[in-house]
Amino acid sequence: MNDINLRQAIIQRVYDKSNEELTDVIESSIGADERALPGLGVLFEMIWLESEPAQQQAMVGSLHAKIQKQTPVQAE
């Protein structure tokens, strides 16, 4: 049996998906169990690596704005 890492497993899971199916994978992962977070991270990494610096900065700006609207949970 071939050993595959997490990135490879996630890419394999979505490899032949249509745009609609890929949208479903993303939307069903958002807000789901935390086990879905690594998959979203791999997909985001793929987008990031193929983005121009201006697009990356736009994503960072959008993310920063969303983070600032959140209320941090205080550790007990």
Protein language model regions, located:
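Short alpha-helix boundary/capping elements
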Residues: 18, 34, 52-55, 67-68
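Short acidic alpha-helix initiation/capping motifs at coil-to-helix transition points
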Residues: 1-5, 34-40
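Short, charge-rich amphipathic interface segments used for partner binding and complex assembly
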Residues: 39-64
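Charged low-complexity stretches with an acidic bias
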Residues: 4, 56-76
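Secretory-pathway low-complexity, repetitive Gly/Ala/Ser/Pro-rich segments with frequent Tyr
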Residues: 20-24, 38, 57
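N-terminal acidic leader/helix
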Residues: 1-28
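Alpha-solenoid HEAT/Armadillo repeat architecture
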Residues: 15, 30, 48-52
